Amino acid sequence: MVNEIDSESLSQRLADTEDVLLVDIRTPAEIAQGMIPDALQLPMHLIPIRMSEIPKDRDVVIYCRSGARSYQACAYLMQQGYGRVLNLRGGIIAWARHGLPIVAPEG
């Protein structure tokens, strides 16, 4: 079973400067529409070859557009031995719906 976090809880953890890594697994075209500040851009299909960029010793919140792909990514990472991954319930849609910050990607 995949652990999840909602937008409000994640926002509070980030405001409290907790050590949380955000990973945006959407496509570059989706990311171009905006992303959660300070998220690592790691398209879902690249996770198996870039897994070393995801730490096992801190909480990692994975998100996509609606939460479905990120749920699958969390399940995959858990199978690979990652115990501290969380799915952002509702994805960036829920994040935006709550009026939380979205920024343009760098570069």
From Swiss-Prot:
Listed EC numbers: 2.8.1.-
Any one biological process term the GO annotation gives: sulfur compound metabolic process
Domain (Rhodanese) ranges: 16-104
Q: Name one GO molecular function term.
A: transferase activity
Has the keyword Transferase been applied to this entry? Answer: yes
Effect listed in the UniProt record for changing C74S:
Still able to bind sulfur in the presence of thiosulfate
What subcellular locations does the record give? Answer: Cytoplasm
Q: What induces it?
A: Up-regulated under sulfur-oxidizing conditions (at mRNA level), i.e. when grown on reduced sulfur compounds such as sulfide, thiosulfate or elemental sulfur.
- Superkingdom of this entry's organism? Bacteria
| Active-site residues from the entry | C64
Entry keyword set: Cytoplasm, Transferase
What is the consequence of disrupting this locus? A mutant strain lacking rhd_2599, tusA and dsrE2, although not viable in liquid culture, is clearly sulfur oxidation negative upon growth on solid media containing sulfide, and shows massive accumulation of intercellular sulfur globules.
Recorded GO CC terms: cytoplasm
Q: Describe the function of this protein.
A: Sulfur carrier protein involved in sulfur trafficking for oxidative dissimilatory sulfur metabolism. Component of a sulfur relay system that starts with the sulfur-mobilizing rhodanese-like protein Rhd_2599 (Alvin_2599), which transfers the sulfur from a low-molecular-weight thiol, maybe glutathione, to the TusA protein (Alvin_2600); TusA serves as the sulfur donor for DsrEFH, which persulfurates DsrC; persulfurated DsrC very probably serves as a direct substrate for reverse-acting sulfite reductase, DsrAB.
Instruction: State how it assembles.
Output: Monomer.
Protein name in UniProt: Sulfurtransferase Alvin_2599
Source species of the chain: Allochromatium vinosum (strain ATCC 17899 / DSM 180 / NBRC 103801 / NCIMB 10441 / D) (Chromatium vinosum)
